[in-house]
Amino acid sequence: AVNRQKLPEGIAGLTRDAKKAGVKFGIWIEPEMINPKSELFERHPDWVIRQPNRETSYYRHQLVLDLANPAVQDHVFGVVDSILSHHPEVAYFKWDCNSPITNVYSPSLGERQGNLYVDYVRGLYKVLQRIAAKYPRVPMMLCSGGGARCDYEALRYFTEFWCSDDTDPYERIYIQWSLSKFFPLKAMASHVTDWNKKTDLKFRIDVAFG
């Protein structure tokens, strides 16, 4: 849900202002995560990956939703679908996932806990497949704490990967060169930043364009 205190007009207001400024609007989302103080957590505590009868370990004040659970898959798809269907002006989105799984237990798998990682990834791919099928023309970047989600299956559903949070142009040369041995150049997202200000702007732009 949109925080109306911060964004009184919601996402619609942002897309409208972006259009007035002559730029396209993109959104950065993290739909696999959940805040333990959220309404969703209060309604569905069984949707969260966490070990029962043990102290819960948090990462960045978040927990991970159990994508091995089909109901959670439907919810995550619904979140993204709601954004894109209600706001067709959204021209791009970045899908991030910054938290490792710190409480390894799926309430939905019962005695099949050994399947958690495999079923989680399969559940994620099911969600991504549905999104890509419904919104094939929306460019999407996949990120996970940097480049932790660079894999061929994911590339079926995303336009590009975020290779690394390291945007130093000198270091980025090695990152992009190494990644190019496995993935096409057009799959590597790269930004021009002020990291390593000793380099001139043209060099940073040249590296970002690969």
Language-model features and meaning:
Residues G22-V23, L84-H87, K134-V138:
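Secondary-structure transition into beta-strands, especially the periplasmic turns and strand N-termini
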Residues A1-G78, H87, Y92:
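Aromatic-lined carbohydrate-binding/catalytic grooves of carbohydrate-active enzymes
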Residues V79-V121:
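N-terminal/domain-start segments enriched in small and hydrophobic, helix-friendly residues
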Residues N35-D74, V118-G210:
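Glycan-recognition surfaces
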Residues R4, E9-A21, L116-Y135:
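Alpha-helix-loop-beta-strand connector modules within alpha/beta enzyme cores
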Residues I29-N35, C97-I101, S144-A148:
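Active-site-proximal loop/turn and secondary-structure-junction residues that shape catalytic pockets
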